[in-house]
């Protein structure tokens, strides 16, 4: 992938029709399965990301897809962050932070009062957890269809 270090980042809604975006979704799923035990992965595949109530965005730098993230409307003015993944060529460049801020802004604009997320446990998840906690997310109870296990954790942000 050709990176463009001086190009500005642009975040836009994505319909997952771009093969590069599809590849990043696959990379995300592979990463989740590689770092979590069977039955403990709740990441959405492409069909799950295309369902009603789910909005997907990509962060682009130049012509490259630098990251992906989604917001799932759970009803009751609550949203769930799904499928946050930065392409390996763009790590530590603020991609995930920009996507997270975008989701928070959109959630507020849609009248949501809370954002929640489920993520894994262990060293592979520490960078993401640090990002969420820096932004004000706090540990909390399981939500929606999730059940607490030793392999997952839940974070929430009141908007």
Question: Where are the model-predicted features located?
Answer:
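Conserved beta-strand-loop-alpha-helix junction that forms the acyl-donor binding cleft
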Residues: 117-128, 146-150
């Amino acid at each position: 992938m050709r990176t463009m270090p001086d190009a500005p980042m642009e975040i836009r809604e994505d319909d997952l029709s771009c093969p590069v975006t599809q590849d990043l979704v696959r990379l995300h799923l592979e990463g989740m399965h590689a770092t979590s035990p069977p039955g403990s992965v709740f990441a959405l595949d492409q069909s799950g990301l295309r369902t009603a109530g789910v909005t997907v965005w990509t962060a682009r730098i130049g012509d490259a897809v630098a990251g992906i993230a989604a917001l799932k409307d759970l009803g009751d003015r609550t949203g769930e962050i799904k499928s946050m993944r930065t392409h390996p060529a763009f790590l530590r460049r603020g991609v995930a932070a920009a996507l997270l801020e975008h989701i928070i802004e959109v959630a507020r604009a849609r009248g949501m009062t809370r954002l929640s997320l489920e993520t894994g446990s262990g060293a592979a998840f520490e960078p993401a957890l640090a990002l969420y906690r820096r932004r004000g997310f706090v540990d909390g109870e399981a939500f929606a269809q999730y059940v607490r296990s030793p392999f997952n954790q839940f974070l929430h942000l009141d908007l």
